[in-house]
Amino acid sequence: MPTLLVVEASPRGEQSISRGLTKMFVNQWKREQHDGRVIQRDLMATDLPFVTMPWLGAYFTPPEHQTQDMKNLLRLSDELVAEILSADHIVIGTPVYNYNVPAVLKAYIDHIVRKGKTLGFSGEGLVKGKACTIVMASGGAYTPDSPIRDRDIATGYLRLILKVIGIEDVTVIAGGNAKAVDMGEISRSDFLEAFASDMADAAARPVVQV
C-alpha cells in the first residue's frame, strides 16, 4: 500500500500558507493513489523535546544496555523514525523564519537522524527508495534573480539532511512572496491556486526504488 507521510511545521493553523499548499499536495496524491495511506505528523501538535544530555546518553548507549528510562526517552524518536521508514513519499510543509526552518522542524530533524536507523555507522544514508516534496512558504522570494537569493538557508539545509539519510529524490515547491497574502495584495486562495500545477506534478511522480 503506497504510504505518504505529511510533516507540518507551521504554527499558523488555518491561516498558514505552507499548510494550505501541503493540503493541495495531499489531495492530489490521494487522487493518484486511490488505495494509499496518509500518516499525519503535525509538529505543532507533537510534544517534541529538544535534545538533552539524558537523551544523548540514551542515544549513545547500545540498545542491549539501555535502561527502561533510556528507552522511554527515545520512544518518540523511534516513532518518528518508524513513520519515515514506512513511507514511500514524504511531504514536508514549512514556513521560512529568518531564512531557515523553524525550531520545531530542526528539533524533528534531530530526532530522525539516528545512527543505526536512518544513518549507517559509516555515514551512509539508510533511507532508500523514497521521494520527498518540500513545500515552503516565505515572505520574500528566493528565485535565481532575487537580490536575497544567497540568504536561502532553508532549502539547502533540508536537501542536505535528506541526502545524508539517503533521500535524493527531492522536489522543492517554494511559495515565495507569501507576505502579499498578509498585506492583502492577493487572496490566500488565489496565492495557493498558482501552485496547483506544481503540486499535481510533484504528487504524480513515481518513486525511484533503489
UniProtKB/Swiss-Prot annotation:
Q: Please state which protein family the record places this protein in.
A: Belongs to the azoreductase type 1 family.
Residues annotated as binding FMN are 10, 16-18
E.C. no? 1.6.5.-, 1.7.1.17
Protein name, per record: FMN-dependent NADH:quinone oxidoreductase 8
Its cofactor is: FMN
Q: Which Gene3D superfamilies match?
A: 3.40.50.360
Q: What task does this protein carry out?
A: Quinone reductase that provides resistance to thiol-specific stress caused by electrophilic quinones.
The record's annotation in Pfam families points to: Flavodoxin_2
Reactions the enzyme catalyzes? 2 a quinone + NADH + H(+) = 2 a 1,4-benzosemiquinone + NAD(+); N,N-dimethyl-1,4-phenylenediamine + anthranilate + 2 NAD(+) = 2-(4-dimethylaminophenyl)diazenylbenzoate + 2 NADH + 2 H(+)
Subunit structure and binding partners:
Homodimer.
Cited PANTHER family = FMN-DEPENDENT NADH-AZOREDUCTASE 1 (PTHR43741), FMN-DEPENDENT NADH:QUINONE OXIDOREDUCTASE (PTHR43741:SF2)
- The enzyme class is oxidoreductase
Query: What broad taxonomic lineage does this protein's source fall under?
Result: Bacteria, Pseudomonadati, Pseudomonadota, Betaproteobacteria, Burkholderiales
Q: Which domain of life is it from?
A: Bacteria
Q: What binding details are noted for the cofactor?
A: Binds 1 FMN per subunit.
Keyword Oxidoreductase among UniProt keywords: yes
The record's keywords, sorted A to Z, are: Flavoprotein, FMN, NAD, Oxidoreductase
Q: Which InterPro entries does the UniProt entry name for this protein?
A: Flavodoxin_fold (IPR003680), Flavoprotein-like_sf (IPR029039), FMN-dep_NADH:Q_OxRdtase_AzoR1 (IPR050104), NADH:quinone_OxRdtase_FMN_depd (IPR023048)
GO molecular function annotations of the record: electron transfer activity; FMN binding; oxidoreductase activity, acting on NAD(P)H as acceptor; oxidoreductase activity, acting on NAD(P)H, quinone or similar compound as acceptor
HAMAP family xrefs: Azoreductase_type1 (MF_01216)
Signal peptide positions on this chain: none
